[in-house]
Amino acid sequence: MVRLIMGLKGSGKTKKLIELVNDAVDSEHGDIVFIERTAKLTYDIPHKVRLIDASQYNFNGYDFLKGYISGLYSANYDITHIFIDNVLAIIGKDIDVDAEDFFEWCELFGIKEHVKFTMTISIDINKATERICKYF
């Protein structure tokens, strides 16, 4: 399952994501991962969640992010949910075909490995393509 939370900067996406993380901690029985661009949410995310500061790595494209996620999962098969805050900013790109392909890859990975993905992206909902719309 892939879920996108979309909206412009300041629309409450990260706040909603934090609420969903807290709900997941209470309701899910596996491990939870949260990837953010910087370490600014260290005190907002429960300590049970594996918090990853993406600025410590060179996330220079979706292929790297796919490999990183695959590596996380191969090291810990108990991961049930991966949250990514502002995935476009982590990669450093706007919404494009590569982003759409990444979301589809996450969907297929999630089905195969029983992992949920919840991500935020900072774009106007009206600019979402059909391939993006199915995730929110």
Show which residues each predicted segment covers.
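Generic beta-sheet signal
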Residues: R3-I5, I32, I79-I84, F117
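Conserved P-loop
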Residues: M1-G71, A128-E130
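Short loop/turn elements that form and flank the Walker-type P-loop nucleotide-binding site
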Residues: E28-H29, I45-H47, N76-D78, K112-H114
